[in-house]
Amino acid sequence: MPGVPEYLRLAEENNGIGSVAGDTVLITVPPESLRSIAGKMFNEFKAVFRTCAGVDERPLNNHFSIIHLFTDDKAGLYIAVKSYLQPEHPVAPSISDIVPAADWCELEAWDLLGIEFEGRVLRRLVLPDWWPQGVHPLRKDFKYDEKPPVAIARSEKLGLREEAGTVPLGPYHPALHEPEYFELYVKGERVVDVKYRGFNVHRGIEKLAESRMNYQQVNFLAERICGICGFEHSTCYALAVEKAAGIEVPERAQYIRSIVLELERIHSHLLWLGVAFHLLGYDAGFMHMWRIREKAMILAEMLTGSRKTYGINLVGGVRRDVSEEKKSRVLSELRELESDFKKVVEIALSTPHVKKRLTGTGVLPREDAWRLGVEGPVARASGIDRDARRDLPYAAYKHASFKVPVYTEGDNMARALVRVMEVYESISIIEQLLDKLPKGPLMAERVEIPPGRVGVQVVEAPRGGDIHFVMTGDGRPYRWRVRAPTYANIPALKVMLRDQYLADAPVTLASIDPCFSCTDRVVLVRENGVAERFTLGVGL
């Protein structure tokens, strides 16, 4: 198993330099070494590719840079592989043929920063068709409130399959809760191909944060990335900044973060189970799951002042404490929730038509799950034993004992069972942390954030790993990159839907628990009706 020495040696072998800061290894190599180092890390070291971030560093050192972010979950390490690129014409070699999951973030870096990637087709991904060519909004010379002239729209035609029927799904559809567009190609009752077009509500939060917000204000922006797992995003951002600045967060604040994170996981999974039962026509299960979920929402409001757990995190700690009275009530309500949930979910998953519709449908083989870099319950249902709470521990998770449920079937039932078992584990984690909750302050004594530092953090959200990359600047992030787990999971739908009955498409789509507000920029392209190409970008 590789460790820090092996990664530092890898940097030297590729004409680069390596350095270590805490749990992060930074490897800086010339662009021509990127493919070699990415291949060894992905294929030999089995490092997990998380995302990449383009950065306009011209005001700092007259260069652009591209940073590929990996994690070595067995060693508990973050590995950032960085290359500096020329300021006039930034070009880097593509690694997407070696690491398929890199396809998406390369396209995003091209679209938003104008970084070209040799050896691949570059397509407009995030920006609308009317956006003028050559204008890249994440460059530092583009002002956040600038309105570029409207160019003539050049809509891209995504080659239809003439031999198959077309079934549009969205952008507004009862099976979708946000505006997205799926185009299913069918022969008879079977799905043979899928096209996906999103990007309808891109909000440009990275540019907003880098342009006009201070570090603490970004917390409140981060938690609004997602309507379900906002606390995961604000925690991930805060941890990344704290790591970059070397801020020691009080232990009590770390415990409170983990408690709220697990409460959010419970209500998210209960919401998903209810939606899944509704899509299967089992509305009794839907009603009961949402009835039980209401207990979690009441606890969230009691602990945080909001059913949506907003306004808790700050860089350096948390804003609300947990009293002894609240501890007692949480423990009592969770015991009742667990008992109620156990009765309902056992009945629901043994209901014949629910069991039949979930078992054997939407299968994602393990090799495809690894190749595409899927996250969370989608990965664990396909036999990939990965969970950042255990592998890359943060907040107070090192003080809790829990199991990571893993199934090998890779079908819709396995993804449901992962979430069911995680509800039980989350209840156990909250009980353990409340029992051990230490005394002490809620905020670090000093919160000083020097410029020029880098922090990378993964937080295991209900849907999988949230990744936040922060390069510190003067009073605000110089670069903030966000990658939501749905970003990694949507491309797997092409595999999961292939050869499935059209009637099973909605529940298979829902089985990844997609959050389009987190991800909302995906295209699935079939070139010339033959060659397949995934393209997706998510920088929020």
Language-model regions, residue ranges each:
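Terminal low-complexity/charged segments
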Residues: 1-194, 268, 353-361, 368, ...
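Catalytic cofactor-binding cores of redox enzymes
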Residues: 131-191, 195-540
